[in-house]
């Protein structure tokens, strides 16, 4: 299983919680050089498993273990080896997660083994999930019971209106929602947004050339001011950059 989605949408946390129901859980992260080397230097899948056991100090038992390969976009070799987990160790539960996989696939020309992996996508929290995170389960039930043409009590309508306005500000990124749910502070959510924005901008340089990364950072900073408007590359480019270069990036 390959779990896809943007950074910081909770992929790793979700897998860890799911794995709590299994006898053993082995997690490796392909942002670490010594872990990536396992997949680039070892080709036999059983030797790969043995190497993972060695660095994790845990036994991997098919049928009882979940092997979690995080940040798989950092290793083409690991992606290619997924088919051999499927073919040679079909009883072993393997979950991988990655961000910006589509970008890597397009820029580097590789693909996932056809018919050997399944995909699930994880998105930011919906409005329903936002209400649940706030602990307002009864209000959520009222929302789910609403039907067109059926009246809604004014207090319920007013509270939902308040929450949807908050949701428009907080958004659905799990950490921002958690900060807001815990404190009720929009400022706390805003601080989280700034941290997330910085981490996203750092990723531009990883997946594009330096010049393109600078264009992307410029667009990223400008987009909030263009929300709701028709895309205009000249406006997004600003005075210092050409619209053609920005469009290409």
Task: Give the location of each predicted region.
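Conserved catalytic segments around the Walker B and adjacent sensor/switch elements
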Residues: 2, 21-36
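Conserved lysine of the Walker
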Residues: 11
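Hydrophobic positions on the alpha1 helix immediately C-terminal to the Walker A/P-loop
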Residues: 14, 18
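Short glycine-rich substrate-engagement loop in P-loop NTPases that contacts/grips substrate
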Residues: 32-65
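Structural recognition of the conserved hydrophobic beta-strand(s) that form the central parallel beta-sheet
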Residues: 68, 93-99, 121, 130
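Sensor-1/coupling segment of RecA-like P-loop NTPase cores
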Residues: 87-109
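Short regulatory helix/loop adjacent to the ATP-binding pocket of P-loop NTPases
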Residues: 102-119, 131-136
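Interdomain hinge/linker elements that couple catalytic modules in large macromolecular machines
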Residues: 132, 137-249
């Amino acid at each position: 299983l390959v779990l896809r989605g943007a950074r910081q949408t909770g992929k790793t946390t979700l897998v860890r919680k799911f794995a709590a129901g299994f006898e053993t859980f082995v997690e490796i992260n392909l942002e670490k050089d010594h872990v990536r080397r396992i997949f680039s230097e070892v080709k036999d899948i059983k030797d790969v498993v043995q190497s993972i056991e060695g660095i994790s100090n845990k036994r991997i038992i098919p049928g009882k273990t979940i092997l979690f390969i995080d940040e798989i976009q950092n290793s083409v070799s690991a992606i290619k080896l997924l088919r051999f987990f499927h073919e040679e160790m079909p009883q072993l539960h393997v979950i991988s997660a990655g961000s910006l996989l589509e970008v890597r696939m397009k820029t580097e020309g590789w693909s996932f083994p056809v018919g050997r992996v399944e995909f699930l996508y994880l998105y930011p929290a919906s409005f329903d999930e936002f209400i649940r995170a706030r602990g307002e389960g009864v209000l959520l039930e009222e929302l789910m019971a609403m039907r067109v043409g059926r009246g809604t009590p004014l207090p319920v309508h007013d509270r939902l209106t308040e929450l949807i306005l908050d949701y428009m500000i907080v958004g659905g990124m799990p950490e921002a929602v958690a900060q807001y749910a815990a404190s009720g502070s929009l400022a706390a959510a805003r601080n989280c947004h700034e941290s997330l924005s910085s981490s996203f901008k750092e990723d531009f340089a990883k997946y594009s050339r330096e010049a393109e990364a600078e264009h992307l950072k410029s667009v990223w900073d400008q987009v909030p001011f263009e929300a709701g408007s028709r895309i205009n590359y000249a406006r997004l480019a600003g005075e210092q950059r050409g619209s053609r270069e920005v469009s290409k990036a």
